[in-house]
């Protein structure tokens, strides 16, 4: 299986702050709690495709 680069987007402001490699066959989108430098706080970042 090949890995694909995907961006993690802040759910509060919409900024794409992080990129990760993920398996494209997954059905659900990845959600992580990360620091957003635009909001200045920890928010949920969702995988954008």
Swiss-Prot record:
Family note: Belongs to the bacterial ribosomal protein bL33 family.
Disulphide bridges: none
Domain of life: Bacteria
Pfam families: Ribosomal_L33 (PF00471)
One of the GO biological process terms: translation
Listed InterPro entries: Ribosomal_bL33 (IPR001705), Ribosomal_bL33_sf (IPR038584), Ribosomal_zn-bd (IPR011332)
Keyword Ribosomal protein on entry: yes
An example Gene Ontology molecular-function term: structural constituent of ribosome
Protein name: Large ribosomal subunit protein bL33A
UniProt entry keywords in alphabetical sequence: Ribonucleoprotein, Ribosomal protein
SUPFAM superfamilies from the UniProt entry: Zn-binding ribosomal proteins
Organism phylogeny: Bacteria, Bacillati, Bacillota, Bacilli, Lactobacillales
TM helices/strands, residue ranges: none
Record GO cellular component, one term: cytoplasm
Protein encoded by which gene: rpmG1
